[in-house]
Amino acid sequence: MARLFVVVALLALAVGTVFAADAPSAAPTASPTKSPTKAPAAAPKSSAAAPKASSPVAEEPTPEDDYSAASPSDSAEAPTVSSPPAPTPEADGPSSDGPSSDGPAAAESPKSGATTNVKLSIAGTVAAAGFFIFSL
């Protein structure tokens, strides 16, 4: 009974490792073809432009502090989140002697299901070897 438990545990571990290796990483990876996207730096505030505490301007609520809108979707001036613009092929410049831009580059080629099938075959082989070893 203990052998069966060990074999099933090895099989589960092998299959789990295969699928964990195919899962995307939680950490973002830097793409060598794209420029890094950083948030724009805020302009430094000068002390002359900042209102003083005794100034009547400082006591009035600013438009950012106005919470009269029920929700951001009700306000027409609500900030929206947008993705950075997609890179255009013209931005890199046309390359007459390079590979054509019709298909993905070698570094950008999508993974096929064949990789997963090979890994599952290896996991099955490990499981079969485990069954054989622990059945002796």
UniProtKB/Swiss-Prot annotation:
InterPro entries: AGP. Keywords: Cell membrane, Glycoprotein, GPI-anchor, Lipoprotein, Membrane, Proteoglycan, Signal. Residues 24-56, 68-81, 89-107 have a biased composition (Low complexity). Belongs to the classical AGP family. Induction: Up-regulated by AHL16/TEK. O-glycosylated on the hydroxyproline residues. It comes from Arabidopsis thaliana. Proteoglycan that seems to be implicated in diverse developmental roles such as differentiation, cell-cell recognition, embryogenesis and programmed cell death. GO terms for cellular component: plasma membrane; side of membrane. GO terms for biological process: pollen tube growth. It is found in: Cell membrane. It is a lipid-anchor; GPI-anchor. Its main location: membrane. Residues 113-136 form a propeptide. The keyword Electron transport does not apply. A lipid is attached at residue 112 (GPI-anchor amidated serine). Residues 24-115 are annotated as: Disordered. Residues 1-20 form the signal peptide. This is Classical arabinogalactan protein 11.
